[in-house]
Amino acid sequence: ASLFNNNPTLEACYADLVYTNKFDTSKNIRYWKSNQFIPGSFSKGWCPPHPTFFVRSSVYEQFGNFNLNYRIASDVELMMRFIEVHKINVRYIPELWIKMRMGGTTNNSFKNIFIQNKEVLNALNSHNLSNNLISFFVHKIISRSLQFFKK
C-alpha cells in the first residue's frame, strides 16, 4: 500500500514468485523471477506472475474487469490489456512477494496448458497485438524452463 501511497501516478506493480512443493512448502520448485515490462513482451509469451500483480481500482473502473470468455487465461488477458494495450504506469519490484504451492487450473494438465496458450494467442489477436506462433512458444518454453533452475 505504501508503494501506491508514495507514488500517486503508479497504477500497478508486480514482483517475483516462488512455487513450492505441493506438500512441503520448504522445497522450492520454481523461481519466477520477472523483469520490467518491455513493449511487445506479451507477444513473446511474457507476463508478470499474476499472484504478485496489484492494480489500483481506478484501472479496473477505466478498462474493465476479467474477461471470462477466457476460461483459463483471463488473468493474462487482463494484464495484457492493462499493460500492453492501455499502457498503464506499471513497475516491477525485484523482490520475492509470493510463495505458493504448485498447482492451479493451468498447470493441472497438459490439456489446460494448451488451452491457456491458445487463449493467450486469441487475446493477442483480439487486441491487435502482433504475434508469431514460433517466437511465442520458443520464448515461453525457454523462459519457463529456466525458472526451474533459478533459486
Where in the sequence are the language-model features?
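Carbohydrate transferase catalytic cores enriched for Leloir-type hexosyltransferases
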Residues: 11-13, 17-20, 51, 131, ...
